[in-house]
């Protein structure tokens, strides 16, 4: 099966979406899937307002169509709700093609913190975006429940996991410390809670 995954988040960005999709690409052969990515590469871009270090693509409708048709996918998954995601969604809707989507980033809260636009507006936009999807993939049951309470439908799981090549009991990290330490790491940004 040939799967086309569109994403607005791609290298050189370092975030959960990019890491998940990169890991998926490495695992594709084990999954017996041929995965192609439609990324922001090659499109003009602009700095994201309030976050100048992050650029967003400005995709051309014809180029989106050309890339999708060149990939000739059996299935289309839209991983992000940015301009590339909206353009792929529009392509699929015009041609009455089924597609799935992912909900990974709390954009309504992100936008509210950075612009003061109420999160309720962002959720209305994202409900509209995902309503056309055959299934909205979420990583956790708590997110599924939260989105369900906010009116999102057709919610399914695409769980993550632990990279067992990096983290496994056969390769323990040994530190000479007087007690056990538990640590979590994540990106620090104003919108992160």
Where are the language model's segments positioned?
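A short, charged, and often flexible helix/loop element on the N-terminal side
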Residues: 40-71, 78, 118
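Active-site proximal beta-strand in glycosyltransferases
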Residues: 3, 75, 90-110, 137
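Conserved donor-binding/catalytic core segment of Leloir-type glycosyltransferases
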Residues: 6, 173-192
């Amino acid at each position: 099966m040939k799967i086309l995954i569109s994403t607005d988040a791609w290298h050189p960005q370092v975030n959960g979406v990019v890491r998940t999709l990169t890991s998926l690409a490495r695992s594709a052969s084990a999954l017996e899937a041929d995965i192609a990515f439609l990324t922001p590469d090659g499109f003009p871009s602009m700095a994201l307002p309030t976050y100048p270090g992050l650029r967003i693509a400005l995709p051309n409708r014809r180029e989106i169509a050309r890339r999708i048709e060149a990939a000739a996918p059996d299935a289309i998954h839209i991983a992000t709700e940015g301009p590339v995601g909206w353009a792929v969604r529009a392509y699929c809707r015009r041609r009455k093609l089924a597609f799935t989507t992912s909900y990974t980033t709390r954009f309504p809260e992100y936008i509210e913190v950075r612009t003061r636009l109420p999160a309720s507006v962002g959720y209305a936009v994202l409900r509209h975006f995902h309503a056309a999807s055959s299934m909205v993939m979420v990583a956790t049951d708590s997110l599924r429940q939260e989105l369900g309470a906010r009116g999102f439908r057709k919610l399914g799981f695409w769980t993550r996991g632990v990279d067992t090549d990096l983290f496994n009991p056969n390769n323990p990290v040994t530190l000479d410390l007087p007690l056990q330490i538990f640590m979590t790491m994540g990106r620090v940004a104003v919108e992160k809670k």
